[in-house]
Amino acid sequence: MPAATKDSDGGWKKFLWNSEKKEFLGRTGGSWAKILLFYVIFYGCLAGIFIGTIQALLLTINDFKPVYQDRVAPPGLSHTPRSEKSEMSFKVGDPSTYQKYVKAMHDFLQAYNDSKQENMMKYEDCGDTPKSYINRGELDNNQGIKKACIFRRSWLDKCSGLEDPTFGFSEGKPCLIVKLNRIVNFRPRPPTSNDSIPEEAQSKVQPDVIPIYCTNKREEDAAKVREIKYYGIQEGFPLQYYPYYGKQLHPQYLQPLVAVHFTNLTMATELRIECRVYGQNIAYSDKDRYRGRFDVKFTINES
């Protein structure tokens, strides 16, 4: 085999540029131009198809009304303060153990301060007793921005944070602020019978309000979870705050709240409590523990 010379390059230089055939990487200028033109047209068509499908999709979307709302699940029931795994543990004699809960409640209730609801161009007084739904028109902007019902923080009484800034945590009598999550154009329907409601909660069934009831989740805790008080409009979610028209049409909307006050919990033991709302179109799911209900675990110690 002849020895390789210093000029030997394996032919790669000629492959890069063949001066005899005027080829770059094995193709002439005309060939490269045809390939470039092909890919420009090919990817241009792909981009056109993609843009066309997006435009077609956007034509089916209403800016104000959900198209497939029949597939939306019933609203979830959530509470403030939230905690990891819904477990709340604190010491009555150590404010640092419950300060994060108190701060979360104050932050959440800022929007419900009277000073934030003074503009009567954005808010209206819907009363402090339950009423039927308020019809503010269709889900479009023909009538402009919808007014929101006022909900006064003071209606939460001892759980408002106005008189007791610790929301009962400093006494071992904690509060939870409960709300139904927002769903556009959803109208919760109150129960019409007591068939699906625990006997202890049947007195809460009344027109124009969605009742809420909390109790011990485990039978062995029945004697340890005693008096529970509820604050808000008729201790439930009044219908005049529904429906919700969405962020664009209802930017000032305030959800009605219910404060749950646990006034007599046994200390130094783990207690699991479940809260549920009751309505004709409110369902529960084992796969979603916040659909129409939630449970929370308290562990309260003296110090």
From Swiss-Prot:
Q: Identify its protein family.
A: Belongs to the X(+)/potassium ATPases subunit beta family.
Principal subcellular localisation of the protein: membrane
Write down the species.
Anguilla anguilla (European freshwater eel)
List the GO biological process terms: intracellular potassium ion homeostasis; intracellular sodium ion homeostasis; potassium ion import across plasma membrane; sodium ion export across plasma membrane
What keywords are assigned to this protein?
Answer: Cell membrane, Disulfide bond, Glycoprotein, Ion transport, Membrane, Potassium, Potassium transport, Signal-anchor, Sodium, Sodium transport, Sodium/potassium transport, Transmembrane, Transmembrane helix, Transport
Entry superkingdom:
Eukaryota
Disulfide bond: present as a keyword of the record?
Answer: yes
| Residue ranges that the UniProt entry lists as topological domain Extracellular | 56-303
Q: Which GO terms describe its cellular component?
A: sodium:potassium-exchanging ATPase complex
Q: Which residues lie on this side of the membrane: Cytoplasmic?
A: 1-34
What is the protein name stated in its UniProt record? Sodium/potassium-transporting ATPase subunit beta-1
Q: Which residues are glycosylated?
A: 113, 194, 264
Which cysteine residues pair off into disulfide bonds? 126-149, 159-175, 214-275
Assembly and binders: The sodium/potassium-transporting ATPase is composed of a catalytic alpha subunit, an auxiliary non-catalytic beta subunit and an additional regulatory subunit.
Q: Name the residues that span the membrane.
A: 35-55
| Purpose | This is the non-catalytic component of the active enzyme, which catalyzes the hydrolysis of ATP coupled with the exchange of Na(+) and K(+) ions across the plasma membrane. The beta subunit regulates, through assembly of alpha/beta heterodimers, the number of sodium pumps transported to the plasma membrane.
